[in-house]
A protein has these predicted regions:
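A general boundary/transition motif marking the beginning of the first structured unit of a protein
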Residues: 30, 139, 200-204
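PAPS-dependent sulfotransferase catalytic core
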Residues: 1-48, 56-58, 164-220
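PAPS-dependent sulfotransferase catalytic domain
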Residues: 49-162
Length: 224
């Protein structure tokens, strides 16, 4: 719910998937429908078409926040919807150093994401994710089919092996702002970008980093 000003699920449901009727849109555009009721409407339209509603949470706002807001370290989407829905929650995680290196490539975060602030948020997120279950991004790039099968099983969804032929051209997704995904055309592990000794020291010296590795079941420190 915190990201509505940037990414609107109602707009996505209408424009990406054609789920909403004109009467639905009129009701939503009146501004009188609470967030949970809007999601319930989308879920109802999914059910009518034998589809399953999957919500991809933007946990950055809840646990890191910068540069948009200060985090409060709570899964606000889940807390907002728990009363109305029986949620199945699951997390995908990446090595915290690689995640930081990826974030700071984006001009929004470069020079605005101190290591200490970032690691506190990631550690708090990892504490939450231990309760939902998680899988590693690195496992997916190493063995896409087996890892995606695990994710589908956790979410009680059928596995579609045809995803390999379609993923690179799939555009109905937010956050895919950096070039290269469709150009590569295959799912593969990439080498870690050079960090330098100073960055490695800044991470390894912090208890939040070491605790996050434990919570996320990473056995290394700064190696990918």
């Amino acid at each position: 719910p915190l990201g509505l000003r940037i990414f609107n699920p109602v707009q996505q449901a209408a424009e990406w998937y054609g789920l909403l009727r004109p009467a639905d849109m009129a009701k939503l555009e009146s501004g009188k429908l609470p967030f949970a009721e809007a999601i319930e409407l989308i879920a109802d339209r999914c059910a009518e078409q034998d589809r399953v509603l999957i919500l991809r949470d933007w946990n950055h706002l809840d646990y890191i926040g910068l540069p948009f807001m200060q985090p409060d370290y709570r899964p606000q989407l889940a807390e907002t919807l728990n009363a109305e829905f029986e949620l199945i929650r699951f997390a995908t995680v990446r090595h915290p150093l690689d995640q930081w290196l990826s974030l700071i490539r984006n001009p929004l975060f470069a020079e605005r994401l101190p290591v200490g602030k970032y690691l506190k948020g990631v550690r708090r997120f990892a504490e939450m994710a231990r309760g939902t279950g998680m899988l590693h991004y690195e496992d997916f790039t190493a063995n896409p089919d087996a890892t995606l099968m695990r994710l589908c099983e956790a979410l009680q969804l059928p596995f579609d092996p045809g995803y390999r032929q379609r993923w690179a051209s799939y555009k109905n997704i937010t956050g895919d702002v950096l070039p290269g995904r469709s150009e590569v055309g295959e799912i593969r592990a990439l080498p870690r970008r050079d960090t330098g000794a100073e960055v490695e020291k800044a991470f390894t010296a912090r208890g939040d980093f070491q605790r996050t590795l434990q919570l996320m079941n990473y056995t290394d420190t700064v190696s990918g």
